[in-house]
């Protein structure tokens, strides 16, 4: 398929192998957006880890200061009482125990995040084959198993993103929408990278943040010059 003049101009704007200041990278992406919907701005971070080694796998979560721009539906497993009330007050769409598990087993899985209190994991554990393949299984490493479900719900709804290294040692994450202000996207990316630095495995050697690239849903990938970010 022949490229349009606009597509050729966008491709020409991205020099292979060149790292761009964050502001320039975002300007390229905003110029490249062409979908009829508001595209997401995503980031890929190549880490200096051996993802084949269990002690070098990086997994965690970050609450993005400017949010993700997405509406998040949350289900919470918590026993009736103060914890359940806390989750509902924080805005959870569904709260329960065995009753909620039965609904999920029957196919009610219209949730983006599932949270559980530690004492509810006996119920959630039975849903491994239902929640696991969808990436919804609660896990303490990403803050979705918590004794404070209200706080966990607020984090999920206010822009918490979860990440883990893939087989190539790369983290993939959304940092906002194409209609976000540049400063908002920059603060989100900075928060994510600072958390990744904190999560650096003790056995990781050499350069840790090897490459940071941003892209839009339908646009090109652009390498970011890390010196244009404040990572201290």
From Swiss-Prot:
Q: GO biological process annotations for this chain's record?
A: regulation of translation; translation
The positions making up the signal sequence are none
InterPro entries referenced in this protein's UniProt entry, alphabetically: Ribosom_uL1_bac-type, Ribosomal_uL1, Ribosomal_uL1-like, Ribosomal_uL1/biogenesis, Ribosomal_uL1_3-a/b-sand, Ribosomal_uL1_CS
The alphabetical list of record keywords is: Repressor, Ribonucleoprotein, Ribosomal protein, RNA-binding, rRNA-binding, Translation regulation, tRNA-binding
Spell out the Pfam families in the cross-references.
Ribosomal_L1
Question: What terms describe the molecular function in GO for this protein?
Answer: rRNA binding; structural constituent of ribosome; tRNA binding
GO CC annotations on file? cytosolic large ribosomal subunit
Q: Which Gene3D superfamilies match?
A: 3.30.190.20, 3.40.50.790
Xref: NCBIfam families: rplA_bact (TIGR01169)
Name the family the entry cites.
Answer: Belongs to the universal ribosomal protein uL1 family.
Protein role: Binds directly to 23S rRNA. The L1 stalk is quite mobile in the ribosome, and is involved in E site tRNA release.
Oligomer and partners: Part of the 50S ribosomal subunit.
Q: Which HAMAP family is this protein grouped with?
A: Ribosomal_uL1_B (MF_01318_B)
Give the protein's recorded name: Large ribosomal subunit protein uL1
State the gene name recorded for this protein.
rplA
């Amino acid at each position: 398929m022949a490229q349009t003049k606009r597509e050729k101009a966008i491709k020409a704007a991205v020099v292979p192998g060149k790292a761009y200041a964050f502001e320039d990278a975002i300007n390229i992406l905003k110029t490249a957006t062409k979908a009829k919907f508001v595209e997401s701005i995503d980031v890929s971070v190549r880490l200096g880890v051996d993802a084949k080694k269990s002690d070098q796998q990086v997994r965690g979560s970050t609450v993005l200061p400017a949010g993700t721009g997405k509406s998040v539906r949350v289900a919470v497993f918590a026993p009736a009482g103060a914890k359940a009330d806390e989750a509902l007050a924080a805005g959870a769409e569904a709260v329960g125990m065995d009753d909620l598990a039965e609904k999920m087993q029957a196919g009610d899985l219209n949730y983006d995040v599932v949270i559980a209190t530690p004492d509810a994991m006996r119920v959630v554990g039975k849903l491994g084959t239902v929640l696991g393949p969808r990436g919804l299984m609660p896990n303490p490493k990403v803050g979705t198993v918590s004794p404070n479900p209200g706080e966990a719900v607020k984090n999920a709804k206010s822009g918490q993103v979860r990440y883990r290294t893939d087989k190539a040692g790369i983290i993939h994450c959304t940092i906002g929408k194409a209609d976000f202000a540049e400063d908002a996207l920059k603060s989100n990316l900075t928060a994510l990278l600072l958390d990744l630095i904190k999560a650096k495995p003790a056995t990781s050697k050499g350069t840790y943040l090897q490459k940071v690239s941003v892209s839009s849903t339908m646009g090109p990938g652009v390498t970011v010059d890390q010196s244009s970010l404040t990572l201290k």
